[in-house]
Amino acid sequence: MGYSRILGTGSFLPSQVLTNAQLAERVETSDEWIVSRTGIRARHIADEGHKTSDLALRAAQAAIASAGIDKGEIDLIIVATTTPDMVFPSTACILQEKLGLPGVQAFDVQAVCAGFVYALTTANAYIKSGLAKKALVVGAEIMSRVLDWDDRRTCVLFGDGAGAVVLGESDEPGILHAKLAADGRYQGLLNTPAQISGGKIQGIPYLHMDGPAVFKFAVKSLSEIATATLAEAGVEQASLDWLVPHQANLRIIESTAKHLGLPMDKVVVTLPEQGNTSAASIPLALDVAVRDGRIRRGQTVMLEGIGGGFAWGAVLLTF
């Protein structure tokens, strides 16, 4: 049984930027209120005509170019998203068509903000088992479409974007260890409860979140799974070069870093400029740090995140 490693990274952000000051013109809030509670200063918003697959395509093309491979070498496409183009088919199938890769196995993973670590773990298993050789793994979201823009508790938090990696076969370990978890008992704390029935949308079509409860659970669960992932991989905390966390809340990120004994200058933070982009946030942050030279080949990196469900997980890798 072989290994897998990341061959290339890519990302895409819509050009439209929505600042806290602009939001304050719409709802009762302020830049100070948002920054003090979340760390967010701005977020990117997709154009009205764009779909999740459009953002995914741009990130995928960048990752393929970064990997230095021909797109025809890709034999698996996984898209992590909670804002698909449509109910079905999968956004991965739509992306496959846009990439011009007919016949390549393609499917979506839905674990909300933990979607990318779930998708990357799945792609790693496919490659290690011989079911794929080169996988395109994408996290893409247009969260702005599921927000109630009159609810200041949630509309200030999220943004749109996409990030991607190409994962390929390797003789040396790249993905060192992955650990996933979920607990459906907490589904009511973070959800979008709408469904289609009888030709109509039934239920509330906007994101709902019990912020304090989510914060409390996230701090505890992320610290525990990050520690367990290192222990099960046999890697000391001191050997960890970078933490690339889901970009949800600066205080949650700081808590996990403190638990791991990492200074914040070893944590990739894109939250202030991008907000919470759900499944896209981890690959977006990873690509930023790869492109600016912070994350380099041979370094030990942990990716971790939590989303509605709750579902959470961590991936430890050598970049």
From Swiss-Prot:
Renumbered residue ranges of the record's region ACP-binding: 247-251
Record bears the keyword Transmembrane helix: no
Entry EC number(s): 2.3.1.180
Any one Gene Ontology molecular-function term assigned to this protein's record: beta-ketoacyl-acyl-carrier-protein synthase III activity
Keywords, in A-Z order: Acyltransferase, Cytoplasm, Fatty acid biosynthesis, Fatty acid metabolism, Lipid biosynthesis, Lipid metabolism, Multifunctional enzyme, Transferase
First-level EC class: transferase
Record's catalysed reaction(s): malonyl-[ACP] + acetyl-CoA + H(+) = 3-oxobutanoyl-[ACP] + CO2 + CoA
GO biological process, one term: fatty acid biosynthetic process
Compartmental location: Cytoplasm
One Gene Ontology CC term in the entry: cytoplasm
Pfam families given in the database record: ACP_syn_III, ACP_syn_III_C
Pathway(s) this gene product operates in, as recorded in its UniProt entry: Lipid metabolism; fatty acid biosynthesis
Active-site residue numbers: 113, 246, 276
CDD domains referenced in this protein's UniProt entry, alphabetically: KAS_III
Alphabetized Gene3D superfamilies for the sequence: 3.40.47.10
Function: Catalyzes the condensation reaction of fatty acid synthesis by the addition to an acyl acceptor of two carbons from malonyl-ACP. Catalyzes the first condensation reaction which initiates fatty acid synthesis and may therefore play a role in governing the total rate of fatty acid production. Possesses both acetoacetyl-ACP synthase and acetyl transacylase activities. Its substrate specificity determines the biosynthesis of branched-chain and/or straight-chain of fatty acids.
Family, per entry: Belongs to the thiolase-like superfamily. FabH family.
Domain notes: The last Arg residue of the ACP-binding site is essential for the weak association between ACP/AcpP and FabH.
Subunit field text: Homodimer.
Listed name of the protein: Beta-ketoacyl-[acyl-carrier-protein] synthase III
Organism from which the protein derives: Chromobacterium violaceum (strain ATCC 12472 / DSM 30191 / JCM 1249 / CCUG 213 / NBRC 12614 / NCIMB 9131 / NCTC 9757 / MK)
